[in-house]
Amino acid sequence: MVNLGQLLSPKRKAPRNPGSKWSRFRKNIFVSFVIDLLVIVGSALVLSLLIKTFLVRSFFVPSGSMLSTLQIDDRIIVNELVPNVVPIERGDVVVFKDPGGWLGTVSTTPQSPIQASVDWFLSAFGLTAPDSSQHLVKRVIGVGGDHIVCCSADGKLTINGKAITETYLDKGIKPSDVKFDVTVPQGSIWVMGDNRGNSEDSRFHGDLPSKGFVAKQFIVGRAVVISWPTAHWTWLDNFANVFKDVPKP
C-alpha cells in the first residue's frame, strides 16, 4: 500500500558533510605547496648547475702543501672566470687539473648507487667536491715569459731579475731548498706551494712532459675565499705588493 504521507512530503537531501569541503581545501593547499616546492628546488638546482659550470665551483683542500694559507680539508670557492675571462696574475692561488704525472695513481673508494646519487646531488649545489683529489692547489709564482731563479745571494726567488720577499710564507720557511732556473712558456704558469718543504710543485716535475709548467688548459680557476669551516673563513689574497716591482719579461 502506498503511503500518502511519503508521496506528499518532499524528499530531503542528505546533509552535506562540512568537513569534506575543508578536507578538499587542505588537500589543494598541500598539492599547491608541493608543486611550488618542486619548482623552487628545480629552479635552484638549474641555477646552481649554471653557476657551477660557468662561474664558481667548490673544492676541498686534500693536502698540506699550502699551509698555513690553507688547512687540510678547508673548502674553497674557485672563480672559474680565471684565466679564460679574467687574466691570471702572479700570487693567485689556483686550482688546476693534474697536467700529467703530478699526482701519480689516485685511489678512489667505490660508492654504492645511493651514495653516488647523493654525492652528485650535493655537488650540483656546490656542497661537495668529489673530484678534489684529482686536482691540485698552488700559488702562481710566474706567468708566461717570466724568468724565475732560485736563489739570489740572500736566498730569495728572483723573477725577471727582481728579488721578491714572499710575505705569504710562514716565518722560518725558505723560498726553496731546490735550485732552479726556468723561463715560463707563454700560455703556462709556474706554481709553488706555500709550505715549501712539503709541496710537490713545479720544482719537482721537470722530468715530465709538462716540464713542471701548468698549461692554461689545465687551470680550473682562482681560489677566492675559504668557505668552510667558518672559523677559517677569509678572502684569499694574491699579495700583489710582493710582485709589484717585478719588471715585464
What do the PLM-derived regions correspond to, one by one?
Residues M1-P249:
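Extended hydrophobic leader/signal-anchor segments used for secretion and membrane insertion
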